[in-house]
Amino acid sequence: MSFKVVIEPRALADIQDGIDYYEDQLEGLGERFSETVDHYIRAISHNPHYQVSHKDYRAVPTGRFPYLIVYYLDEPAETAYVMAVFHTSQNPKKLPK
């Protein structure tokens, strides 16, 4: 069963920051980052319970980019809320609550 995915404003800003950063590093890399994030967000929709689970949230690593897509599930609404796209070098205490 697929869940609806809602991307919260902070996560949208995180994604745009990542795109801008990678595009500044190498032309086309920002687009690859965006495509990678989109791929994993679709994976969350199709299999929301699969990824790493923490007390208050779940997180899926983005493969070749050092980011986690942080989300929580609203089981009754069958919705996954993406709260952040979090660079793994950041302090985990900065994760949204």
Task: Give the predicted meaning of each segment.
Residues 12, 38, 88-89:
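Alpha-helix N-cap/helix-start and coil->helix boundary motif
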Residues 16-19, 38-45:
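Structural signal for well-ordered, non-membrane alpha-helices
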Residues 31, 72-97:
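Enriched for short, Lys/Arg-rich terminal
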Residues 39, 47-79:
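Basic/aromatic recognition patch in beta-strand/loop cores that engages polyanionic ligands
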Residues 1-34:
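Arg/Lys-rich, positively charged N-terminal/basic patches that mediate binding to nucleic acids
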